[in-house]
Design a protein with these regions (language model features):
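Phosphate-coordinating loops and pocket residues in cytosolic domains that bind phosphorylated ligands
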Residues: 22, 62, 171, 180-181
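GST-like domain detector, emphasizing the conserved glutathione-binding G-site
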Residues: 1-107, 111
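Terminal-tail/helix-coil boundary detector
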Residues: 175-185
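Short, solvent-exposed turn/loop segments enriched in Gly/Ser/Thr/Pro and often Arg
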Residues: 9, 137, 182
Length: 185
């Protein structure tokens, strides 16, 4: 999709400034603003919206109600289970200087994230993607969390199903350009 990316949040700041807060009172990223002034925040909501609006072929939003529910289930799992587990890992290993790291919190986060990823590993033993035989919007946010787990976590257990799936989604140019090809910072 044609878009303009504005770097906001983290080292770029701006999320606490009045213009941004008017769009997203949470002061978090991402925020989608369309040319007509429509504003939407929350990552998974934005993914679902863009798929519904632009994916006329139905390649991202499963047409089958049950497959669509499974895709949404994994999106919500990413948000409610993986996100809280991986946050101390990401912040601890990527954003915190070595001398200031809380290794106990990082270790606990790695254990929780690993347990969650083992659920994904089991799911991917059956279909090739989280919601079935085809890539869907459910794979996008889960893939983002996998990227955050695979790269900084030392000595993670073997997860061949997840590795196969991650290789498949990473081979997709949009995923590579937006996620996999960008260093964690």
């Amino acid at each position: 999709l044609a878009h303009t990316r504005l770097d906001v949040g983290g080292a770029f700041g701006k999320t606490k400034e009045a213009p941004y807060l008017a769009m997203n009172p949470n002061a978090l990223v991402p925020t989608l603003e369309e040319e007509d002034g429509f504003i939407l925040w929350e990552s998974n909501t934005i993914v679902r919206y863009l798929a519904a609006k632009h994916d006329k072929a139905g390649a991202l939003e499963p047409k089958d109600l049950k497959a669509r529910a499974i895709a949404s289930q994994w999106m919500d799992w990413q948000l409610s289970v993986v996100g809280p587990a991986i946050t101390p890992v990401f912040w601890g290993l990527i954003r915190t200087p070595v001398e200031k790291r809380d290794m106990a919190a990082i270790k606990a986060g790695i254990e929780k994230t690993t347990a969650a990823m083992q659920m994904l590993e089991a799911q991917l033993a059956r279909p090739p993607f989280v919601a079935g035989d085809a890539f869907s919007y459910g794979d996008i946010p889960v893939g983002c969390m996998c990227y955050g787990f695979r790269h900084p976590v030392p000595d993670r257990p073997a997860m061949p199903n997840m590795d196969r799936w991650y290789a498949a989604i990473s081979a997709r140019k949009p995923f590579h350009d937006a996620i996999g090809g960008i260093p964690l910072t």
